[in-house]
Amino acid sequence: MSNKGQLLQDPFLNALRREHVPVSIYLVNGIKLQGQVESFDQYVVLLKNTVTQMVYKHAISTVVPARPVNLQQEQAAE
């Protein structure tokens, strides 16, 4: 993945993780997963609900937070 993609993706996922924001993750096959982002790396997102699921990023279509996320604060920290 290019650095430009990482400049948006990492701060967004990190804000979701840090603020414990509930998310809906839609996969490319249409399945909807719900939970909180526990952790992530270059290839996977750990999504915690009643269990922790490892979701491969290449299978993710959309990440929808349950509430607005402030990325300005996250970008200022970098």
From Swiss-Prot:
Gene3D superfamilies per record? 2.30.30.100
Per its UniProt record, what SUPFAM superfamilies does this chain match? Answer: Sm-like ribonucleoproteins (SSF50182)
Tell me the function of this protein. Answer: RNA chaperone that binds small regulatory RNA (sRNAs) and mRNAs to facilitate mRNA translational regulation in response to envelope stress, environmental stress and changes in metabolite concentrations. Also binds with high specificity to tRNAs.
- Which PANTHER family would you find in this protein's record? RNA-BINDING PROTEIN HFQ
Family classification: Belongs to the Hfq family.
The protein's matches in NCBIfam families, at most eight in alphabetical order, are given as: Hfq, PRK00395.1
Database matches in HAMAP family? Hfq (MF_00436)
Q: Which Pfam families match?
A: Hfq
Q: Which organism is it from?
A: Dechloromonas aromatica (strain RCB)
| Coiled-coil regions listed | none
GO biological processes: regulation of DNA-templated transcription; regulation of RNA stability; regulation of translation, ncRNA-mediated
A GO CC annotation given for this chain: cytosol
Residue span of the signal peptide, if any?
none
Its assembly, as annotated, is: Homohexamer.
Q: Which superkingdom?
A: Bacteria
Keywords linked to the UniProt accession: RNA-binding, Stress response
For this entry, the protein name equals RNA-binding protein Hfq
Residue ranges constituting the Sm domain according to the UniProt record: 10-69
- Give any GO molecular function from the UniProt entry: RNA binding
Entries under InterPro entries matching the protein:
Hfq, LSM_dom_sf, Sm
